[in-house]
């Protein structure tokens, strides 16, 4: 196979192939970030749906024009 500069840069990323962290690894951390992302999406949805009313935030199409 031909060696390229891009392959040399990306090789360290592939050197850990097949290795997994013992036990649950970073799964709890991933779950925490998924929960925070869910809360973020819910806040955005509530602002858009006008369920969460914020002073000075107008969610009409006219405000974008």
Curated annotation (Swiss-Prot):
SUPFAM superfamilies: Photosystem II 10 kDa phosphoprotein PsbH. Its main location: membrane. PSII binds multiple chlorophylls, carotenoids and specific lipids. It comes from the Bacteria. Keywords: Membrane, Photosynthesis, Photosystem II, Thylakoid, Transmembrane, Transmembrane helix. Residues 1-28 are cytoplasmic. It is found in: Cellular thylakoid membrane. GO terms for biological process: photosynthesis; protein stabilization. Pfam families: PsbH. It is a single-pass membrane protein. The chain crosses the membrane at residues 29-44. GO terms for molecular function: phosphate ion binding. The keyword Cell division does not apply. Residues 45-65 are lumenal. Coiled coil: none annotated. One of its GO terms (cellular component) is plasma membrane-derived thylakoid membrane. PANTHER family: PHOTOSYSTEM II REACTION CENTER PROTEIN H. One of the components of the core complex of photosystem II (PSII), required for its stability and/or assembly. PSII is a light-driven water:plastoquinone oxidoreductase that uses light energy to abstract electrons from H(2)O, generating O(2) and a proton gradient subsequently used for ATP formation. It consists of a core antenna complex that captures photons, and an electron transfer chain that converts photonic excitation into a charge separation. PSII is composed of 1 copy each of membrane proteins PsbA, PsbB, PsbC, PsbD, PsbE, PsbF, PsbH, PsbI, PsbJ, PsbK, PsbL, PsbM, PsbT, PsbX, PsbY, PsbZ, Psb30/Ycf12, peripheral proteins PsbO, CyanoQ (PsbQ), PsbU, PsbV and a large number of cofactors. It forms dimeric complexes. Belongs to the PsbH family. This is Photosystem II reaction center protein H. It comes from Thermostichus vulcanus. The gene is psbH.
